[in-house]
Amino acid sequence: ISGKPFGWNLPNWLLRREMVSRIAELPNVDFRPGVGFDRMLARDAEAIVTLTEGTQISVRLVIGADGRGSAVRKAADIDVKTKRYGQKALTFAVTHDAPHENVSTEVHCSGGPFTLVPLPDHEGRPCSAVVWMNDGTKIANLAALDPASFDAAATARSGGIYGPLTCVSKRGTWPIISQIASAMNGPRAALVAEAAHVMPPIGAQGLNMSLADLACLLDL
């Protein structure tokens, strides 16, 4: 309405690059890529955490930011309520003839939305990421199509707004669920991001909520 962008789409690789770069600048951070949380013992003054490579560390607070299947949440004995919608999302990237002008587009019809998110050009052609939602059986059938049939189905579902679509990536499928933890904290533990709550992707608010969780935790 104001003419200003409603939001910005940032690729995961860019976010990871910038976060890793920032982490490298922080003297109080011990970054251990490839090492995960195994278990913890909560005490009055500390938590003893055992990592997947066998080492133990003593910390004042364990922050569970380890996703919807959070091991930290389970170790803190925090229950979770999950709602399943019987839908899945099919994700992939396409090239097309018409430029996307850096605008995301959603095409709605029965079964679920078909969302095109602008990406940088691929081999000189306009490129978009796609999130295609439908019931689980339909998505499984689409994921199994041969390339030509899949491109034709994606083009038809898009309404042809960018012209013929050509898939240029692997196809991934994701279950559509919502999830909420029964508590956001436990003994010497706190939950953020998808360890605490999961939303369907249609609102595109998962990252924003995760960042808000971190801001809230810092303010406590």
Predicted regions and their residues:
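A secondary-structure boundary/capping signal
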Residues: P11, P33, M133-D135, A195
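Conserved mid-domain beta->alpha element of the FAD-binding
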Residues: G172-L220
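Short, solvent-exposed loop/helix junctions and linker helices
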Residues: W8-W13, A144, N208-L211
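Conserved FAD-binding catalytic core of PHBH/FMO-like flavoproteins
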Residues: E46-Q56, L61-R171, I176
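Short small-residue beta-strand/loop micro-motif enriched in glycine and branched aliphatics
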Residues: K4, I139-A140, V198-P201
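Structural motif
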Residues: R43, S110, N185-G186
